[in-house]
């Protein structure tokens, strides 16, 4: 550390961090001419060297120019200069403070004095507030209508192809794909056919609604099974849980339930994917398959590809006895 720099650190105004008043700051921002603590120096580094060129007072080598910047600067001079702008005083974070016009004026003023030239304040247009910038940048972009039209055409094609298949044959033999209901008010005790046709039939009229309703039906089915397990197994026998044999029966029931849910999801997902492979991708090998794979995989494949349920019947529950 140079003698001049050592003398600057001994001045009373430089014995506290400029930003947080922590004692004995061991870091400095050359182009701002201020002494700062370790914590604040990390935030200053995040501003970039154009905004704040951070150096360690004891561990870094200093050039004569850098030391001179600290001489013409200093915490006291910086405070006097920056406090004239209400925006700097009102700023909440280090990033906000040193992205103000007054902070840029300080950098230019120090540079001019080190170069031995007169500093002239530059008039700048009023900058947009940081709050407005954040609000603008965080606005969710709207989805282009072209994308929606392309999706509608794609799913309409699926519905048209499926409607031409015979409904008296299974899908594996070229028959029509049946599946999820198409109405939110579907009676769970009635078939999908009696409640508006199959899932793929509805794609031709309202693709987005069909996909949404299909997943809602599946979700309600799973939810109903969970309620059945709770009503049939858990609630009636809660007082018997201390019996080892009873606990074993409970765990076997839960394992079977979990396996059934997973297998149901896998079958439904496989059926839909098979239809796409047979009718869309086979006709147009150049079709952008990844886009629709991602859209269709999102709810179904997550369940179908999940790991097997843990066998709770093998767990040791003695600690609850």
Swiss-Prot record:
Pfam families: ArfGap. Residues 180-201, 281-290 have a biased composition (Polar residues). Coiled coil: none annotated. Residues 160-201, 281-321 are annotated as: Disordered. One of its GO terms (molecular function) is zinc ion binding. The keyword Cytoplasm applies. GO terms for biological process: COPI coating of Golgi vesicle. Residues 311-321 have a biased composition (Basic and acidic residues). A zinc finger (C4-type) spans 17-40. Residues 2-119 form the Arf-GAP domain. GO terms for cellular component: cytoplasm; Golgi membrane. Its main location: cytoplasm. PROSITE patterns: ARFGAP. It is found in: Cytoplasm. Transmembrane segments: none annotated. The keyword Ribonucleoprotein does not apply. Keywords: Cytoplasm, GTPase activation, Metal-binding, Zinc, Zinc-finger. GTPase-activating protein for the ADP ribosylation factor family. This is Uncharacterized protein C622.14. The lineage of its organism: Eukaryota, Fungi, Dikarya, Ascomycota, Taphrinomycotina.
């Amino acid at each position: 550390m140079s003698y001049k720099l050592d003398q600057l650190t001994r001045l009373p105004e430089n014995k506290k961090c400029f930003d947080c008043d922590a004692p004995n700051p061991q870091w400095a921002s050359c182009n701002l001419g201020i002494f700062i603590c370790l914590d604040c120096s990390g935030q200053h580094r995040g501003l970039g060297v154009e905004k704040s060129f951070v150096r360690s007072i004891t561990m870094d080598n200093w050039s004569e120019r850098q030391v001179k910047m600290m001489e013409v600067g200093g915490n006291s001079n910086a405070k006097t200069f920056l406090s004239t702008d209400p925006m700097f005083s009102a700023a909440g974070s280090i990033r906000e403070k040193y992205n103000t016009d007054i902070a840029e004026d300080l950098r230019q003023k120090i540079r001019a004095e080190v170069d031995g030239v007169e500093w002239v304040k530059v008039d700048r247009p009023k900058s947009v507030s940081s709050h407005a910038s954040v609000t603008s940048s965080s606005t969710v972009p709207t989805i282009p209508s072209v994308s929606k039209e392309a999706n509608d055409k794609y799913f309409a094609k699926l519905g048209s192809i499926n409607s031409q298949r015979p409904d008296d044959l299974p899908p594996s033999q070229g028959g029509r794909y049946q599946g999820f209901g198409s109405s939110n008010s579907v009676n769970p005790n009635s078939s999908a056919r009696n409640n508006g046709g199959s899932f793929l039939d509805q794609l031709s009229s309202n693709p987005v609604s069909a996909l949404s309703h299909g997943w809602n039906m599946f979700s309600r089915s799973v939810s109903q099974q969970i309620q059945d397990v709770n009503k049939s197994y858990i609630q009636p026998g809660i007082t018997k849980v201390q019996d080892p044999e009873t606990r074993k029966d409970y765990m076997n029931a839960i394992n079977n339930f979990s396996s059934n849910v997973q297998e149901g999801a896998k079958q439904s997902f496989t059926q839909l994917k098979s239809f796409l492979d047979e009718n869309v991708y086979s006709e147009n090998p150049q079709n952008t398959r990844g886009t629709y794979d991602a859209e269709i995989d999102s709810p179904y494949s997550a369940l179908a590809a999940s790991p097997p349920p843990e066998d709770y019947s093998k767990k040791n529950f003695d600690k609850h006895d």
